[in-house]
Amino acid sequence: MKNSIISYPRIGANRELKFAIEKYFKAQSSKEELLETAKNLRARHWKDIQNAGIDFIPSNDFSLYDNVLDTAVLFNIVHTKYKNLNLDALDEYFAQSRGYQGENGDVTALAMKKWFNTNYHYLVPECDDASIIALTGDKIFKEYLEAKELGIESKPVLIGIFTLFKLIAFKDKKTQKLAKEKLLNAYIELFDKLNELKVTWLELDEPYLVYDLSKEDIALFEEFYQELLNHKKDLKILLQSYFGDLRDIYPKLLESKFDALGLDFIEGKQSLALVQQYGFAKDKILFAGLINGKNIYANDYAKSLKLIKELQKYTQNIILNTSCSLLHVPYSTEFESKLDPSYLKLFAFAKEKLQELKDLKEILNSSEENPLFKANQELFKNIPERLDEKVKARLKALKKEDFTRTPSFKERALIQKEFLKLPLLPTTTIGSFPQSADVRSNRLAFKQKKISAQNYTEFNQQKIKECIQIQEEIGLDVLVHGEFERNDMVEYFGENLKGFLFTQNGWVQSYGTRCVKPPIIWGDVSRTKPITLACSKFAQSLSQKIVKGMLTGPVTILNWSFPREDISLKESTEQIALAIRDEVLDLENAGIKIIQIDEAALREKLPLRKSDWHSEYLDWAIPAFNLVHSGVKAKTQIHTHMCYSEFSDILKEIDAMDADVISFEASRSNLSLLDTLKAVHFKTEVGPGVYDIHSPRVPSVEELSLTIEKILNKLPKEQIWINPDCGLKTRAYEEVIASLKNLVTATQKIRKQL
């Protein structure tokens, strides 16, 4: 029995990659220094994996920003607008990921989307008429040889041709048709080069196969691989899937020329049933994904061994594997000195998951009497308490009316127009303002008990004063307090709710250099005291204008945390919803007129197969949001915000959330959402983000005016809000002030024309 992993976290044990790239962006280090840091990280990760006894060690899973972008660059799928900047290869790469504004030109970044059902974001490759698709890159070969120099025969990992083709944004059908053959030829050339290097295994990741596949999808997949696999020669090909099962194509894969199939037995609900029904091919190896790559709880070896024994009825050719990339979990628990050992022993981050694979291999190669098995089973005895009877009783007492807000949206809209007295096209921001080094230092000093609570609060209040003053000077209509007291929109609430645990160093990559530290939902959740009330009251006291109360919604708190596995996601979300509901009512009672409840991650756990959308997710996720705000008065305006996602197919469900205003991140997708909003007669007032805050470029008044006009051409003027597409926490003040001034100027210019 051997073992494998799909891929490993890139950012480093202490986010070394993040800091190295950010230094390069600020021109504080050279290209050579950045690439040296990256090379050292790769070497360290390979050695960690090798030392853990993993047999199939991945290469080419490392990325400076995003592996989808890496794959596009490998095959020269780069839009002409980036080529025309005439930058060197590295800066052209970063121009695609961040946008570019300088002496060589002014271009926006590629669109960003959620990677399937995760909180990782990928960049959408763009292919236009001038794109010459060919194997022009060498990253996959260089990194294979790099590992080889360290004495490691690695398994290069690459996004498969079918998934890549489905993810590319083609200019039109003609461009797409021409690209198909060119891309196939490029993959064939890649196979030839890997054969020249005498590579043994290539892993092709095809997660798109876990979606609902049409006949056309299956035909396209077969067309690609019937040709491609004829060129594999001595190269062995592992077709790797994750985030679901292969029910639409599994029987065909058994008859294909792939040397191995990677199945997900964690999220793949039907993976085991498919093997039981159709068996497994004698000429193939099964890479069995049984170590959860998306959650941090320790593996129960008894369950894994039971699964392996069942699979062995159908094949003896089994490799133990992760369910997906370990990119989605933190690096290692060894940096967690503050978590009680009674909890910590029950968690496995990326490095510990390597150990779990090693243990399982050793147990399977010996017997179940192995001490490693006994030690694992001991972990699950005498675990810390998780239940709270008061929370259970409160959930049980919920009635149907607790999930419905009255009066109707139309009635509320009239009441709110009269009460709030806002102008046409009201301007606002999404919530957070830049968190400079002094803000982070103040928070750290307070956490380390180097300053008093009073000093900490006074510092934040001064920052709030400055933030309110800046917004008033710019001329925004609805203000925010800036969120200087918050480290993260989820972690901050988790820290103030009972039932959560926190890591010191549990960082996970969200996109590029953006890392998040997800809380761990351990027990039943409740609110023990007000969380945001003091900050919101203080901020509102500083201005005659409305200052929004800012909260994170229950679905996002769940989706951006590591969830419990002992109760349903529905129950866990409803517990959080009740806690946030208490906060909403406190804010309203304190005179806060607009309360924003962000559901940035609403789409994240939406099942990848449409048949499961309602029964497994939307039927409880939407009511959980309703539960949060159903108790407020008609005059209180409820806002929500949603991050990069595909919304067009769930807009009716989003409308059913019954918020009064919703802001979307829409700028990177060229506001393509507007046509769908119009088509479904979306009732909620909307703020489609008018510029991309994830890029350092400052949009001009002219650019913003054109964007606002585009929105007005699609939606009624009474329904529109003007705002950036996300919070401003990660930007510099000079960028923020310049952009917001242009936003207000553009809005005022358009108002005069209405």
From Swiss-Prot:
Tagged with keyword Glycoprotein: no
Quote the Pfam families the UniProt record gives. Answer: Meth_synt_1, Meth_synt_2
**General function of this protein:** Catalyzes the transfer of a methyl group from 5-methyltetrahydrofolate to homocysteine resulting in methionine formation.
Which residues are 5-methyltetrahydropteroyltri-L-glutamate-binding? R15, E16, L17, K18, K114, R514, C515, W560, E604
What EC class does the entry list?
A: transferase
EC number from the UniProt entry: 2.1.1.14
* Name the UniProt record assigns to this protein: 5-methyltetrahydropteroyltriglutamate--homocysteine methyltransferase
Which Gene3D superfamilies does the entry mention?
Answer: 3.20.20.210
Q: Which organism is it from?
A: Campylobacter jejuni subsp. doylei (strain ATCC BAA-1458 / RM4099 / 269.97)
> Which residues of this UniProt protein bind Zn(2+)?
H641, C643, E665, C726
How and how many cofactors are bound, per the record note?
Binds 1 zinc ion per subunit.
Q: Part of which pathway?
A: Amino-acid biosynthesis; L-methionine biosynthesis via de novo pathway; L-methionine from L-homocysteine (MetE route): step 1/1
Q: Its catalytic activity?
A: 5-methyltetrahydropteroyltri-L-glutamate + L-homocysteine = tetrahydropteroyltri-L-glutamate + L-methionine
> Which keywords does this chain's UniProt record carry?
Amino-acid biosynthesis, Metal-binding, Methionine biosynthesis, Methyltransferase, Repeat, Transferase, Zinc
Q: Name one GO molecular function term.
A: 5-methyltetrahydropteroyltriglutamate-homocysteine S-methyltransferase activity
Which HAMAP family does the protein's record reference? Meth_synth
